[in-house]
Regions:
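Beta-strand-rich N-terminal accessory domains
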Residues: 1-33, 37, 41, 49-64, ...
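Extended, loop-rich substrate-binding clefts of extracytoplasmic carbohydrate-active enzymes
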Residues: 67-125
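Residues that act as N-cap/strand-start positions at coil-to-secondary-structure junctions
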Residues: 6, 39, 51, 81-84, ...
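Hydrophobic residues embedded in beta-strands of well-ordered beta-sheets
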Residues: 10, 97, 127-130
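Acidic, contiguous internal or C-terminal segments within carbohydrate-active enzymes
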Residues: 1-3, 105-154
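Short, surface-exposed beta-strand-loop junctions and turns on beta-sheet-rich folds
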Residues: 8-9, 17-20, 72-73, 105-106, ...
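Aromatic/His-enriched, Gly/Pro-containing loop or helix-boundary segments
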Residues: 39-46, 108-110
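Conserved small/polar residues in nucleotide/adenosyl-binding loops
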Residues: 163-169
């Protein structure tokens, strides 16, 4: 389940080892909680995911001073970050959703008009694929990401520190 408020992944049901569907994405039960609790569960993050030191950056000789929302820094695009935006639905099917957001030059202090499309696809092998596409009309900075948290046990009260994930060396 994905909401167009912040492009958030609200739930992701996957089969466990017994074939029972379990929600493995952490989130809230009420949309109001996504607005009122500042944890970014499942959100699309932008214009710039991460912290911009002191809310300042220089691009092509121009210094930009962004609003600060995190101890004197700009975090995840600030208070007007993409995670606080209502996205337009462009395409929807049983296995695919495309959302779109246009932000004007100067929005949240960032240069350039930016048109972002994000496509969520459920694959036949039970994967969630998130693809980002963005265009702009002038040099800007852009760092898009998704802020989902996963609990692979499917039990939100179970400590996820009990799990290890093998990876190639």
């Amino acid at each position: 389940c994905i909401t167009n408020y912040g492009g958030r992944v609200v739930s992701l049901m996957v089969p466990d080892k017994n074939g029972e569907l379990r929600d493995v994405v952490l989130g809230h039960d009420l949309i109001a909680d996504y607005r009122n609790i500042d944890n970014n569960f499942g959100a699309l993050i932008g214009r710039y995911g991460n912290r911009i030191d002191k809310g300042k950056f220089t691009l092509d000789g121009v210094e930009y001073d962004l609003p600060k929302n995190n101890f004197g820094h700009c975090l995840h695009g600030g208070e007007k970050g993409f995670h606080h935006s209502v996205w337009d639905m462009v395409q929807i099917s049983d296995t695919l959703l495309t959302l779109r957001l246009n932000t004007p030059d100067g929005y949240a202090g960032f240069p350039g008009n930016v048109d972002v499309q994000v496509t969520y696809t459920l694959t036949s092998d039970n994967a969630l694929r998130i693809a980002y596409r963005a265009t702009t009309d002038k040099p800007t900075i852009l760092n898009l990401t998704n802020h989902s948290y996963f609990n692979l046990s499917g039990n939100p009260s179970q400590d996820c520190l009990l799990y290890t994930s093998p990876s190639p060396r």
